[in-house]
Amino acid sequence: MSGPNGDPDISAEGIIEDEDEFNEEEYAAIDSMLDQINSCLDDIEERNDALNGKLQELLESNRAARRDFRQQITDHADLPPPANDDDEDEQSRDAQKKD
């Protein structure tokens, strides 16, 4: 018969019980592995913090560049457009045709 979640009914046999004993060597090995994992996680956290700092600097630099670019566009929008050499050549040709 299955349980309330559809899981099969499993007997308690084969399940680790609190009575199981680990010797000191096994505890030391587990402790060593946990220390290594902790060290790796600390290293990952440091790298993550460094990358986050660099990304924040890049983001601020990008914002400043966009702000400067917008300001340049605004400043240049107030100026008349530069004369185009093609327009002058066309006007010269039109004047020559009339003569």
Curated annotation (Swiss-Prot):
Domain of life: Eukaryota
Ranges for region Disordered: 66-99
Coiled coil: 34-71
Subcellular localization(s) per the UniProt record: Cell junction; Cytoplasm, Cytoskeleton
InterPro entries associated with the record: BBLN_eukaryota
Ranges of Basic and acidic residues composition bias in the record: 66-78
MF terms in GO: molecular adaptor activity
Keyword Cytoplasm: yes
GO biological process, one term: intermediate filament bundle assembly
GO cellular component: anchoring junction; cell junction; cytoplasm; cytoskeleton; subapical part of cell
Keywords for the protein's UniProt record, in alphabetical order: Cell junction, Coiled coil, Cytoplasm, Cytoskeleton
Protein task: Essential for intermediate filament organization in intestinal cells, interacts with intermediate filament and regulates intestinal lumen morphology.
Protein family membership: Belongs to the UPF0184 (EST00098) family.
Name assigned to this protein: Bublin coiled-coil protein
Organism expressing this protein natively: Danio rerio
